[in-house]
Amino acid sequence: MTEHRLHPFAALRVLRKTLVLYLVPLLRVLFERNWAALRAALRQDLILFLLVCALSWVILHASSWSLDESGTFCLHWKLLFRFDRTVRGASLAALTIERPFYYRLAGASRVTLYPVGEPKQRTLTLCLRRADAQHLADQLLPIEAPSLHRPKGGERAALGLLGANSLSTLALFLLAIRQTQQGPDRYELAFAQINFLAGLAARWLPAGAAWLLAFSGFLLGLSLLRSFVQTVHYEVWHTSTQIGSRGGWLDRFECRVKSDQISFADVRLSPFARLMRRWPVFVTAGSCSPELPLFVYRSGEEALFRELLPEFRMPPDLLARTEQRSLIFFAPAGIPFALCLLLTLVSATVLPQLTVTLLIPTLFFGALLAGAAAGYRREGLWLREGRMTLRRQQGLYLHCICVLHPDVCLTATQSPWAASVGRTNLTLTFPGWVKLKVRSVPLRDAEKFFKFMETN
């Protein structure tokens, strides 16, 4: 059994954690403009950096990994004492391979192993060479006769939103420049192309609020650009025992999940998804909850969905029972919304130039409050065709979830008020200590879940 070394990028974690140690004193001296002290701090930081590099070198040469013929992975540590951690391929729930752009330049890959039932703190993350990472994944979770699919829903949705955001952000930047530099200038030709609504906004929007909106739109555009780059060359595959996906342009990502270890599948409905009529589907296996969806399907084209996850059942399109329901749904967004609204109303008479600026957080929390109202009417539990299904609201996202794993722990908690009106909070705990909480549901609905767990 041959032992292999980790990639040198494995030391980046140590360097990143110690970065603050020699940057904070340097910044303090720099602001004081004491150049003699600055040179002394630079010398100290250089010595500290060399010590950290030496420590990283020791860590790299004291650690190694090996893989035997039976598919058992072992991570070794040999410095002062010997420590080995062993993971069998049969005990894995999922495996991910990440190759950020700077990793690709150095030929490195970040591999994360998710053992069955282990929490996220017990996952194993390695930095390996690209060929070693691919070989390790093929040995632990081999792909045999996969069926490939290349859904275009996510790529088109991200591209459409990115285009709309780019146009709106450009208009906001032009408005901000116009508010900052009043009078005819070289931007007049550009503003001639802005429609009546943009001109109206330019008249009433202060410069500070315009720049704030433009910066917010720019950050949203970066997020959408990242989403689009991640969905390029995206493909989904499945075998008799596994399901997975891979893709990306600058940053590459691959996920392999055992089908029998999927805890639940989650269809997330957001305002953008409703607008584009494309629904992202996420899966969770053990403590593995990938940031990217497994696939995105379009309304009316559910064939791929049924092929990849035939056991999935969508929660029924029903309104939840709201009689005697707790108003805790509205607290997280309602309190800051009321505060911002009060400040906006006060500024209208005391400081009118801040009114429009204060409207921005007011509208933001107002949108969250609208999401809370949707959760108040839609969140609930249902048994459908032998599957536990639930719907829960988080911010602007409505999660439609189907439980697929038999090992689920149900916990019902009641306050005295909830007990008096027959309501309870139900928490579902899955392998890997992943928890889902459904708030203020009827006690009789929760009891149906308990009886279902006892008989199945």
Protein language model regions, located:
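N-terminal basic, Ser/Thr-rich segments that initiate or prime the first beta/alpha elements at protein or domain
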Residues: 1-456
